[in-house]
């Protein structure tokens, strides 16, 4: 390093006045005779020989300094690269291994050896790929976002749930953090009671809570249903008709949701489905479903149909008899503690139930709105179009975005109240579709005034003129200032369900590999 400094910043030379006998140096530092104005005589032959020797010595010294400087510079560059990028020869899998061996917080476990961690991760990844082959789209999505595992069962945190309904996929590959029963109980002790609920419940809890798979299905149902249906849902929970819902009644209806979602098993996959049920429900549930007709065929109903139809009351008979067994098998979760207290003895009334459902819808909408508002009170009309088209199957969204960009000359913005009222309208989309179909049957498209009137008749909501005009500018592709069923209803049905109807995993290669492995094993 000293040689490098001497090369880059050479020490100052003495002036001619202080060194009259020194030969004058050229701009490159070589001897070039006596300096002008210096006293002395011209060089003799002997002096010329001495000058040649001095010049040769100078050259050797300069080359030595250059060599040392180059070596020092190369070493410095190598050190910087190593610090920034690490060892380029290292195996990437070995570099990633330490991240997978971190023990759960609060537990004094020894670090897992790297070799064992690599083997465990590879085995778990293969099992995950195999189980995805037998899972439904909702099961795959739950397992994709779940981040906690307790005694073999997977759970989402409140933060995981928010991500699952507001993003397409996790930003990073999730690893399941293992919790003991004691750690889970300690986490649930921070859950607030239902009367302290708010529209920021999930954001406040963040990762200090757990949501089971059946609760995930229940919460998805809440997000897409109108306020008028909340009473129907509560009455279906209230099996004894006392206007209160206890923990057993809540778990019985969750069991209905689970059985409705179970995928019909094919020959040869019993073991894989059993492993999948253990991950999703925490126990090996029986495969026979009460949601069957006399002919043994699965009833084709939505979750809301299960809640809405009075004939569904008969479905509780089989499950109500073994409600105690279900209660003993199901682990406590944030939702159960929030509704029924830490001891599970509290009961839930309709007002608290309604407030929870309304707060959940509001919280998810607030998160989506704030992600585009950048701290402002409004979002642009183009951002509103982005949100509406986000979970749809529309391939070329640029056409709709250009409609807004060029049709609305002056940007006024969409407020949160307008934003929320529109999504409340979407939750009533089925009733609105009936009214809109009546116009289509008459071979008519619908204008803005007719649209507002149909929305009010079907849902009781009054949409602002600016909001209605923005919707028409987005979906009026043929520029006739009219709206048809094809232009609007079909796209909005996809948006209402946030892509869950047609959700497909993006991991195409692992799925293909699992399918190929299954085919080879069957031969």
Curated annotation (Swiss-Prot):
One of the record's GO molecular function terms: calcium ion binding
Induction: Down-regulated in skeletal muscle from aged mice.
Keyword terms, alphabetized: Calcium, Disulfide bond, Membrane, Metal-binding, Mitochondrion, Mitochondrion inner membrane, Repeat, Transit peptide
CDD domains for the chain: EFh_MICU3
Domain of life of the native organism: Eukaryota
Record-listed Ca(2+) 1 binding positions: 238, 240, 242, 244, 246, 249
Domain named EF-hand: residues: 226-261, 395-430, 464-499
Coiled-coil ranges (or none): none
Protein's job: Tissue-specific calcium sensor of the mitochondrial calcium uniporter (MCU) channel, which specifically regulates MCU channel activity in the central nervous system and skeletal muscle. Senses calcium level via its EF-hand domains: compared to MICU1 and MICU2, MICU3 has a higher affinity for calcium. MICU1 and MICU3 form a disulfide-linked heterodimer that stimulates and inhibits MCU activity, depending on the concentration of calcium. At low calcium levels, MICU1 occludes the pore of the MCU channel, preventing mitochondrial calcium uptake.
Free-text domain note: EF-hand domains 1 and 3 have high affinity for calcium and act as sensors of mitochondrial matrix calcium levels. EF-hand domain 2 is degenerate.
Name of the protein in question: Calcium uptake protein 3, mitochondrial
Naturally occurring in which organism (per UniProt): Mus musculus
């Amino acid at each position: 390093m000293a040689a490098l400094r001497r090369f880059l910043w050479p020490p100052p030379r003495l002036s001619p006045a202080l060194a009259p006998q020194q030969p004058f140096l050229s701009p490159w530092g070589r001897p070039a005779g006596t300096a002008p104005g210096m006293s002395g005589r011209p060089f003799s032959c002997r002096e010329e020989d001495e000058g040649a020797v001095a010049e040769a010595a100078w050259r050797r010294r300069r080359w030595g300094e250059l060599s040392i400087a180059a070596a020092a510079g190369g070493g410095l560059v190598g050190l910087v690269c190593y610090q920034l990028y690490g060892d380029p020869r290292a195996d990437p899998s070995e570099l990633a291994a330490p991240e997978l061996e971190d023990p759960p917080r609060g537990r004094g476990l020894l670090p897992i050896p790297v070799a064992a961690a690599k083997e465990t991760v590879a085995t778990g990844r293969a099992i995950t790929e195999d189980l995805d082959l037998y899972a439904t789209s909702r099961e795959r999505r739950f397992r994709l976002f779940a981040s906690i595992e307790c005694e073999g069962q997977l759970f989402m945190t409140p933060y995981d749930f928010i991500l699952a309904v507001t993003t397409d996929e996790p930003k990073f590959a999730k690893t399941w953090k293992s919790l003991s029963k004691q750690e889970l109980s300690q986490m649930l002790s921070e859950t607030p009671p239902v009367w302290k609920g708010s529209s920021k419940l999930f954001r406040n809890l963040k990762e200090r809570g757990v949501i089971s798979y059946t609760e995930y299905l229940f919460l998805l149902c809440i997000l897409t249903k109108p306020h008028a249906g909340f009473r129907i849902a509560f009455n279906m929970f209230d099996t004894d008709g006392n206007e209160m819902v206890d923990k057993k009644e809540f778990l019985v209806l969750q069991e209905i949701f689970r059985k409705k979602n179970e995928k019909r098993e094919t020959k040869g996959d019993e073991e894989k489905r059993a492993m999948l049920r253990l991950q999703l429900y925490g126990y090996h549930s029986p495969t026979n479903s009460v949601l069957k007709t006399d002919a043994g065929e699965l009833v084709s109903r939505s979750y809301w149909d299960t809640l809405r139809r009075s004939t569904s009351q008969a479905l509780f008979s089989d499950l109500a008899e073994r409600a105690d067994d279900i209660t003993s098998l199901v682990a406590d979760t944030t939702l159960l503690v929030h509704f029924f207290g830490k001891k599970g003895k509290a009961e839930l009334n309709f007002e608290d139930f309604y407030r929870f459902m309304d707060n959940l819808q509001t919280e998810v909408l607030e998160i989506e709105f704030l992600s585009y508002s950048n701290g402002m009170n409004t979002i642009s009309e183009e951002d509103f179009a982005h949100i509406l088209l986000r979970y749809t199957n529309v391939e070329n969204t640029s056409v709709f975005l250009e409609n807004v960009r060029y049709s609305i000359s002056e940007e006024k913005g969409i407020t949160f109240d307008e934003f929320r009222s529109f999504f409340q309208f979407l939750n009533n989309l089925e009733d609105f579709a009936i009214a809109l179909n009546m116009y289509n049957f008459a071979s008519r498209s619908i204008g803005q005034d007719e649209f507002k009137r149909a929305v009010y008749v079907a849902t009781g909501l009054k949409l602002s003129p600016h909001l209605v005009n923005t919707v028409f500018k987005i979906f009026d592709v043929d520029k006739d200032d009219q709206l048809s069923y094809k232009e609007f209803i079909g796209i909005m049905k996809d948006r209402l369900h946030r892509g869950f109807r047609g959700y497909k995993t993006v991991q195409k290669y692992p799925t293909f590999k699992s399918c190929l492995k299954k085919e080879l094993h069957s031969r």
